[in-house]
UniProtKB/Swiss-Prot annotation:
The gene is gatA. The keyword Transmembrane helix does not apply. This is Glutamyl-tRNA(Gln) amidotransferase subunit A. The keyword Protein biosynthesis applies. One of its GO terms (cellular component) is glutamyl-tRNA(Gln) amidotransferase complex. It catalyses: L-glutamyl-tRNA(Gln) + L-glutamine + ATP + H2O = L-glutaminyl-tRNA(Gln) + L-glutamate + ADP + phosphate + H(+). SUPFAM superfamilies: Amidase signature (AS) enzymes. Belongs to the amidase family. GatA subfamily.
Length: 481
């Protein structure tokens, strides 16, 4: 019962072939069996889950259900939810029970979706491997010696392991797309401002965006329909008419122009990644898509620009964790200043501290112009590159990561880890939508994904292209043993 896609589960629930309680119980049993080794979930509450499932069954019986009523979903630990611990995988918030619910979570609760639990992540979403979690690293379900990716690694792992039909993640520099690639699932980062950030704990506010993670592009489209929309509680939320993101799922690819950025197909990629790209190119050609070379010359500037800007925003956002009103507080201190210092020293992990220090440095007097202001200018150049490319093509095909998932504990420096985000970060700098879908396997049997990038508000076009690829391939249907 836990093998269903979100769409399949929806059909079975609406036709009353299964009940929401039966489905939730099956997932809870699978979680109890497999999660201790996977560590994908960090918070489970069976009583809350089953109460939501019973309410969903009542709603279905009364005939006022939505297509998502009764379908289980997992939430990355970055989303606040009333009555649930919302820790952001940090010691700083280990004891924080949220008094309110994030808009995206509330949207899915209003649809009648059933909360399975809260998934592991890199602390405060800062990381690419899920090793920065206070609760220990989540494992890759294809090989537990390897990382699931980050920062939404737990969400990717539980969907891949069939411990949830779908999950919500967040993407600041690739945190939906990179773990989706490493775990062999589909995940989409929408256009910045399309999905409300209210109740999603802030890392870098001008980058953060929530999005769905599931087995298929069709599932992601269905979830995206439910979570998008203007929210007056989020000042960056865009006022636009609601879209149907499933509208292009059956659109053929004939004549669609796909750009191949020459800077993304170089020697920095592993042979496995190049094979996955070629697999996708062959599928696109077979369906009549037109492939053209484009250039994104500022790609090499995206990493330094991102880590200056995101760290600056993180340093500001994380100043709220001081031990005064909520979260961890040091047990012993002589005065207020010492309490602040000890609380933050004890509560934050090493990667979070590193980014706070980088952010404080680049915003400091004498360095603001040299780093922060220059990075903002580079951000515009990166965005302009994409607009030049989209004048010639409809979508861009690119790698998601230069390699398959690395091993847990791989001796990589912070800079090497940052460089693994080279293909995802530029999309966040520009605020564009992008989707990762499975496109093959490494020689070691690990999934490898590719990403489709679109212009602003082209989510339906991206999802349609991904769906057509998945109708003609079966990588998304593979699952770990």
């Amino acid at each position: 019962m836990t093998q269903y896609t979100l769409k399949q589960a929806s059909v079975l629930l609406q036709s009353k072939q299964i009940s929401a309680v039966e489905l939730a119980s099956a997932y809870l049993a699978a979680i109890a069996e497999k999660n201790p080794a996977l560590n994908g979930y960090i918070t489970i509450d069976q009583d809350k889950t089953l109460a939501e499932a019973r309410a969903a069954d009542e709603r279905i019986a009364q005939g006022n259900a939505s297509a998502l009523t009764g379908v289980p979903v997992a939430y990355k630990d970055i989303f606040c939810q009333t009555g649930w611990r919302s820790a952001c995988a940090s010691k700083m918030l280990d004891n924080f029970i949220s008094p309110y619910t994030a808009t995206v979570v509330q949207n899915l609760l209003d649809e009648g979706m059933v909360t399975l639990g809260r998934t592991n992540m890199d602390e405060f979403a800062m990381g690419s491997t899920n090793e920065n979690s206070f609760y220990g690293a989540a494992k890759n379900p294809w090989n537990p010696e390897h990382v699931p990716g980050g920062s939404s690694g737990g969400s990717a792992a539980v969907v891949a392991a069939r411990l949830a039909p779908a999950a919500l993640g967040s993407d600041t520099g690739g945190s939906i797309r990179q773990p989706a690639s490493h775990c062999g699932i589909t995940g989409i980062k929408p256009t910045y401002g399309t999905v409300s950030r209210f109740g999603m704990v802030a890392y870098a506010s001008s980058f953060d965006q929530a999005g769905p993670m599931a087995q298929t592009a069709e599932d992601c489209a269905i979830l995206l329909n439910a979570i998008t929309g203007f929210d007056p509680k989020d000042s960056t939320s865009l006022e636009r008419e609601k879209e149907d993101y499933t509208r292009d799922l059956n659109q053929p690819l004939k004549g669609v122009k796909i750009g191949l950025p020459k800077e993304y197909f170089g020697e920095g990629n592993s042979a496995d990644v190049l094979t996955a790209l070629q697999n996708t190119i062959d599928l696109l050609k077979a369906q009549g898509a037109e492939l053209i070379e484009v250039s994104l010359p500022q790609t090499k500037l995206s990493i330094p620009a991102y880590y200056v800007l995101a760290s600056a925003e993180a340093g500001t956002n994380l100043s709220r964790y001081d031990g005064v009103r909520y979260g961890h507080r040091a047990a012993q201190f002589a005065d207020l200043e010492e309490m602040y210092g000890k609380t933050r020293a004890e509560g934050f992990g090493s990667e979070v501290k590193r980014r706070i220090m980088i952010g404080t440095y680049v915003l400091s007097h004498g360095y603001y112009d040299a780093y922060y202001l220059k990075a903002q200018k580079l951000r515009r150049l990166v965005a302009d590159d994409f607009q030049t490319a989209f004048a010639r093509c409809d979508l861009i095909l690119a790698p998601t990561a230069p390699t398959a998932a690395p091993k847990i504990g791989a001796d990589a420096s912070p800079v090497e880890t940052y460089l693994s985000d080279i293909y995802t970060i530029a999309v966040n700098l520009a605020g564009l939508p992008a989707l990762t879908l499975p496109a093959g396997f490494s020689g070691g049997g690990l999934p490898v994904g590719v990403q489709l990038v679109g212009n602003y508000f082209a989510e339906a076009k991206i999802l349609g292209a991904a769906h057509q690829i998945q109708l003609n391939s079966d990588w998304h249907g593979k699952r770990p043993e």
